[in-house]
Amino acid sequence: DLRTDWPAGLWMYKWAHSTISNGVLISEPTESKKTINRAIAGFGRCDANWFHFNIETLPRILSASGFTEIGVPVLVQSDIPQSAVDAIVATTGREVIKINSDFLQVNELIVSQAKSATMDSVFLDAVNGVFTPASIASVRESLLKALPPGEGGNKRIVLLRQGSYRRIKNIKKVLSVLKEYGFEFVDIGSLTLREQIDVVNN
């Protein structure tokens, strides 16, 4: 079952169908427009989401990069933000190739299993619970080594995100009160990785 057994985690490239209750439909190419000899799989669940990318996708990329020779690129989904691309380049030094609607054939795809990263749910068994402190600490160390913090910014910040889920019903009132106390509002997803580090360096 590709929905649960795919080695990279939850398989995102599937479509629901009214006549299929326990299966998935996968678009299979009839021909390849481009071929790459080797590449690291740098995609997973909700990669365009800043939270999911940092605790799930990036640790798996770092894991695979650790035992793969220099020069092998990282494949990512085309919709990930520039800050995510910056993070991959800064921590691995590898070329990042965005996968668009064209089909790409990879002769050898290097996949780091989902259990090598922290998941945001208990979909996979985790010895230390939902969050693995060692995994998060490793990602933090890699990022700060590649991009050391600069000058500290405002001590009072509110991290905002664009999205239609898990919204605060009275967000306008909340922001109004926070503004009175001198908080700065930051859409973290719109910043580059360098800007993200500087914003929270306080």
What are these regions (language model features)?
Residues 1-202:
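The feature primarily captures lumenal catalytic ectodomains
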